[in-house]
Amino acid sequence: MASMTDQQAEARAFLSEEMIAEFKAAFDMFDADGGGDISTKELGTVMRMLGQNPTKEELDAIIEEVDEDGSGTIDFEEFLVMMVRQMKEDAKGKSEEELANCFRIFDKNADGFIDIEELGEILRATGEHVTEEDIEDLMKDSDKNNDGRIDFDEFLKMMEGVQ
């Protein structure tokens, strides 16, 4: 086996032994000739089998990134890097979806913004002792375009600091 790149070592560190074994089993099913690589065509099938759902565009972009030598094939280490990337993307998408749901709940009047009254309600609902000054400070810090309310992008930025 060729020496691992930093990316490949990172990918292995991110995954449990069980996951690596599961990915290897799926990979091997499509490595028909046992040569240690699969064609880019088979890649989508393998990823779907492992619960990933890349679009055609995502697949093309992934393949372009991963198939550095342009051989049209991907070896197992390249495959691991790609799967980890995809898993992280999916996780990011999920947390953004959860935050969108929170935003909708916090945006009581459904105008697409969280105003200072709504922000105050949210903070008081946590049970923490919150002063008007605390609420105003958070609004000031979060309201990047200074329109007196928090839009969804500002909310995402605000929540990045929380997680």
From Swiss-Prot:
Residues the record lists as binding Ca(2+) 1: D31, D33, D37, E42
InterPro entries xrefs: CALM/Myosin/TropC-like, EF-hand-dom_pair, EF_Hand_1_Ca_BS, EF_hand_dom
GO molecular function terms attached to this record: calcium ion binding
Domain EF-hand: 18-53, 54-89, 94-129, 130-163
Blocked amino end (Ala): residues carrying this PTM: A2
GO cellular component, one term: troponin complex
Sorted UniProt keywords: Calcium, Metal-binding, Muscle protein, Repeat
Residues engaged in binding Ca(2+) 2: D67, D69, S71, T73, E78
Binding, Ca(2+) 3: D107, N109, D111, E118
Stretch forming the signal peptide: none
An example Gene Ontology biological process: skeletal muscle contraction
Coiled-coil parts of chain: none
Effect on the protein of changing T131I: Decreases calcium affinity
Binding site for Ca(2+) 4: D143, N145, D147, R149, E154
Functional note: Troponin is the central regulatory protein of striated muscle contraction. Tn consists of three components: Tn-I which is the inhibitor of actomyosin ATPase, Tn-T which contains the binding site for tropomyosin and Tn-C. The binding of calcium to Tn-C abolishes the inhibitory action of Tn on actin filaments.
Remarks, miscellaneous: Skeletal muscle troponin C binds four calcium ions.
Family of the protein in this entry: Belongs to the troponin C family.
Protein name (record): Troponin C, skeletal muscle
